[in-house]
Amino acid sequence: MQESSISEKIKELRTDLKMNQKNFSAAIGIRQSTLSSYENGVVTPSNDVLLTIAQKFHVSLDWLFGLSENKVQISNL
């Protein structure tokens, strides 16, 4: 199985949510051009941005980093 990059995971998440770049970037507090740079692999998102994505859209950081196939964030009960 091919490992996906963070840029591919961000784009996959956005398209799964049926969001355009404008709405997704606004939801996480970044510019659309910055999101485009992330998705195209030009710039690597900071840890703060990745944490915001994980929290806002309830996905695991392990999934974003390609360390797990489990997309859903498991909360501590």
Model-predicted segments: where are they?
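DNA major-groove recognition helix of helix-turn-helix/homeodomain DNA-binding modules
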Residues: 48-63
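Residue-level detection of the helix-turn-helix DNA-binding "recognition helix"
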Residues: 11, 15, 29, 40-42, ...
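A secondary-structure capping/hinge motif
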Residues: 34, 41-44
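Short alpha-helical DNA-recognition segment
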Residues: 18-37, 52
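Residue-level signal for the short linker/turn that defines the boundary of a DNA-recognition helix
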Residues: 8, 18-19, 45-48
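Short, charged recognition helix plus adjacent turn
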Residues: 1, 55, 65-77
